[in-house]
Amino acid sequence: MAGLPDRDKLIRNFSRCLNWEEKYLYIIELGGQLAPLTEQQRHPENLISGCQSQVWIAMTLSAEGHVIFAGDSDAAIVKGLVAVVFILYHDLTPQQIVSLDVRPFFADLALSQHLTPSRSQGLEAMIRAIRTKVADLSAH
């Protein structure tokens, strides 16, 4: 997560944006800070179904048992949403991720109201897929 802000800084930066155009640009900027995926990480098993755009999310466990995320999308705003989700789940264990409901966070940022229905559905699909895959990750 090199380069991405922590959760508190994300909230501060988001609140400094004067309008939704600036907020969208900030989200896109966050997506641009994600490290590129390897060809191996772009494997079909990492492709998230339920998203209108192509979204890949790869997860591994650190030696400390925290989930390490890598992700990408072919749509800039979606790639930014991937980055926001990674910020929220940063440094958590699989059990913590499964039990953490991040939807209220998106509601607090008013993101839910300002995304198109297809983007909102895609965001929900991403969160569901992460929680499902992370449960499998901890089982192995």
From Swiss-Prot:
Q: Which InterPro entries does UniProt cross-reference here?
A: Cysteine_desulfuration_SufE, Fe-S_metab-assoc_dom
Ranges in a coiled coil: none
| An annotated GO BP | sulfur compound metabolic process
Q: Where in the cell is it found?
A: Cytoplasm
Q: Which domain of life is it from?
A: Bacteria
Q: Which residues form the signal peptide?
A: none
The yes or no answer to whether the keyword Cytoplasm is present is yes
Give the UniProt keywords, A-Z.
Cytoplasm
* Positions of the catalytic residues: 51
List cellular component terms (GO): cytoplasm
Q: Does the keyword Cytoplasm apply?
A: yes
Give the pathway listed in the UniProt entry for this protein: Cofactor biosynthesis; iron-sulfur cluster biosynthesis
Quaternary structure, per UniProt, is:
Homodimer. Interacts with SufS.
Which NCBIfam families does its entry note? Answer: PRK09296.1
* Family according to the record: Belongs to the SufE family.
- Free-text function comment from the UniProt entry: Participates in cysteine desulfuration mediated by SufS. Cysteine desulfuration mobilizes sulfur from L-cysteine to yield L-alanine and constitutes an essential step in sulfur metabolism for biosynthesis of a variety of sulfur-containing biomolecules. Functions as a sulfur acceptor for SufS, by mediating the direct transfer of the sulfur atom from the S-sulfanylcysteine of SufS, an intermediate product of cysteine desulfuration process.
Q: What is this protein called?
A: Cysteine desulfuration protein SufE
